[in-house]
């Protein structure tokens, strides 16, 4: 995120918060891996600023994505950080409910949260971070969740961390919240982190070259087959303008109907100028992030046009 954008959004949030004072508590929905041009720890800075506005006596609770880069600043300036439990993500609603119940419990005096994050230097590819099927990360998540509701454990989560960040203290591990029992929080968080470390080699993905992936896909009966170029994921901050997979499809599966997503404003503009049904020749890809490759020449027909807005 640009520094200017972050400052504007942050000031808007803090101004709204200041006008709302006095308040009983704060509940924030965050990601946890935000990076600003001049600031590595977006959420840590934001939580620190929120804490400065509301003071130490107002509870602050936030939800975090499983790929959050949980920093000491985040832990120190929040009373509770509640992690998502599923990947692929499908528990937004229930995670919000758990966070709201945590905040209400603090306000009602039902418990006094103590929170610890323990990390190990492991970066996990999204390919192996799933929680729906059997696998190393799913095992870690089940282990953490099995402790909730026992021995004063209010919440236990496992974080994959965003593997493409380049920041200090990056790592995966466990975050545990207990009812006033710091020793138990430390013990369980460190046990989750240790188990993560013990499974680190199980978390090494088996990846394929584009040509090999296409060959295996063509051997499958039925369809469709999804090829995922994870390093060019727009949701993870990449430009999403790589044409590596598209180029391989043209070379190895030219007769098979295929669909590729490429972010290329210049190419889109040319198609809009040419109009629906027109034949166009253009250079596609690697205009936003040219360090990873060169555009390829493509010729085709404009089948659809849209304004890019979705509902």
Which residues fall in each region the model found?
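Hard-cation-handling environments
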Residues: 124-311
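Core alpha/beta catalytic barrel or barrel-like domain that forms the active/cofactor pocket
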Residues: 28-31, 67, 114-117, 159-160, ...
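N-terminal glycine-rich anion-binding loop in soluble enzyme alpha/beta folds
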Residues: 1-16, 171, 175-178, 182
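Conserved anion/nucleotide-ligand pocket segment
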Residues: 96, 100, 104-145
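Short, compositionally biased low-complexity segments
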Residues: 76-79, 110-119, 164-168, 187
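Active-site histidine-anchored catalytic micro-motif
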Residues: 2-10, 17-111, 224, 229-243, ...
């Amino acid at each position: 995120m640009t520094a200017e954008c972050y400052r504007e959004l942050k000031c808007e949030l803090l101004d709204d918060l200041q006008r709302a004072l006095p308040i009983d508590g704060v509940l924030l929905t965050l990601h946890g891996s935000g990076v600003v041009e001049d600031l590595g720890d977006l959420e840590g800075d934001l939580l620190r600023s929120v804490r400065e506005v509301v003071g130490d006596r107002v509870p602050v609770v936030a939800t975090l994505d499983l790929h959050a880069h949980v920093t000491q600043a985040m832990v120190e300036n929040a009373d509770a950080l509640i992690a998502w439990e599923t990947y692929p993500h499908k528990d937004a609603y229930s995670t919000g409910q758990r966070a709201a119940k945590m905040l209400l419990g603090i306000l009602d005096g039902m418990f006094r949260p103590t929170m610890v994050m323990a990390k190990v230097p492991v970066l996990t590819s999204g390919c192996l971070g799933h929680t729906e099927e059997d696998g190393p990360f799913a095992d870690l998540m089940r282990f953490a969740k099995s402790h909730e509701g026992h021995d004063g454990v209010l919440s236990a989560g496992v974080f994959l961390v965003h593997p493409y960040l380049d920041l200090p203290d990056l790592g995966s591990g466990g975050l545990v919240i207990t009812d006033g029992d710091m020793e138990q929080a430390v013990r369980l968080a460190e046990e989750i982190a240790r188990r993560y470390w013990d499974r680190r080699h199980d978390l090494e993905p088996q990846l394929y070259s584009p040509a090999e992936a296409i060959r295996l896909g063509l051997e499958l009966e039925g369809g469709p087959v999804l090829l995922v170029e994870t390093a060019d994921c727009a949701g993870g901050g990449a430009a999403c303008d790589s044409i590596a997979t598209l180029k391989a499809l043209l070379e190895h599966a030219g007769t098979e109907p295929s669909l590729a997503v490429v972010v290329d404003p210049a190419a889109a503009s040319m198609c809009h100028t040419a109009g629906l049904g027109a034949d166009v020749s253009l250079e596609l890809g690697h205009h936003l992030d040219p360090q990873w490759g060169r555009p390829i020449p493509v010729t085709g027909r404009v089948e659809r046009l849209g304004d890019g807005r979705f509902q």
